[in-house]
């Protein structure tokens, strides 16, 4: 990742470097998710993307219904580091029960929030899938479905010209 402020990286690294996340560190997952988001924003020409990249870097810092990370970091401190818009998105994302289902229901207003949640979840699932392929050589069918569905929703609801998924799927 090229555009992340060293202060943000140092802060998130200090909070997450020793926290496991599957086969690797939580920090590794957060950093690579931000990298996926950065590339996605560039590929679909989202110019004001800093808050999305920062939100991806911190996307599970408060823990989620899927990842039970807890730290003593405050919303105020995170807001100082990544800004109010990114932190508000992170806090909302972290506190959504059954997050993937709720995001896929396309029920959040304003439309910008819904789009940002789709993008954050997409970056998260793509990053985890890349790690799965690198570690095991296989893709989880549920993640394939999730990536395809979110990608389709971003194209259909927001007219975004999404890049192809970074995987080759066998045709049936």
Where are the language model's segments positioned?
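Metal-dependent phosphohydrolase cores
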Residues: 1-172
């Amino acid at each position: 990742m090229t555009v992340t402020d060293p202060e943000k990286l140092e802060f998130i690294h200090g909070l997450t470097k020793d926290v496991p996340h599957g086969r690797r560190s939580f920090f590794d997952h957060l950093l690579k998710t931000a990298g996926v988001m950065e590339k996605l924003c560039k590929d679909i020409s989202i110019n004001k993307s800093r808050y999305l990249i920062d939100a991806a870097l911190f996307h599970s810092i408060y823990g989620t219904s899927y990842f039970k990370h807890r730290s003593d970091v405050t919303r105020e401190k995170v807001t100082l580091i990544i800004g109010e818009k990114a932190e508000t998105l992170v806090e909302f994302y972290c506190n959504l029960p059954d997050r993937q289902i709720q995001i896929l229901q396309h029920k959040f207003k304003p439309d910008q929030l819904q789009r940002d949640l789709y993008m954050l979840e997409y970056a998260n699932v793509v990053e985890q899938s890349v790690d799965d392929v690198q570690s095991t050589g296989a893709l989880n069918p549920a993640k394939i479905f999730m990536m395809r569905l979110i990608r389709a929703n971003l194209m259909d609801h927001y007219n975004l010209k999404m890049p192809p998924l970074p995987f080759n799927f066998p045709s049936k």
